[in-house]
Amino acid sequence: MLFKKYQFPINLFIIFEKINPVIYTSQVLTPNHYVCFIPSKWYYGLNLVLKKELFYNNSYLTDMSCIDTLKYDKFIPELNLLNNKRFLIYNIYYFYWIKVRLTLVQFSESKIESIDSVYKNASWLEREVGEMYGIKYTNKKDNRSLLLDYSRNEYPMLKDFPCEGYYEIYYDFFDNKLQYIKNEFIEL
């Protein structure tokens, strides 16, 4: 066996009992990894508990990302959290003392509460997800863009974003400025 099996902490089950999540785990592939689907209204409070609780205070947020479910046609009955929401946002946490990895998954439309006051590295991860998917964070301290132009409201990771983008951008050395040329889409 490659992994040493650690038990999921019982006090985390007690916290999860209130919010009624759907929890998945794999005993064969990665036995110390749990995936929990939670309602988005419990997102900030659950992050506070995971960071401030004495038993979990060595937890850290390792990754945050998003999935666009625009043309998602599969429906799993026990995952009734989708409810016509477009984005599936997931956070991956690691707990040092109990050697457990936890993934929190929530479904959201376009606004969720920021957790950058709880986890310091969440600011960068939220800026990245917000810029690529267009998700707005409430109570966020730093709303600067990372890669994209401030003047554009384009979100390149969405499924309805064209492959070639909306504009062709190049630097014109003769005029000494950026030039934007609108792409013309040709259907084959």
Residue ranges of each PLM-predicted region?
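Terminal low-complexity/charged segments
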Residues: M1-L188
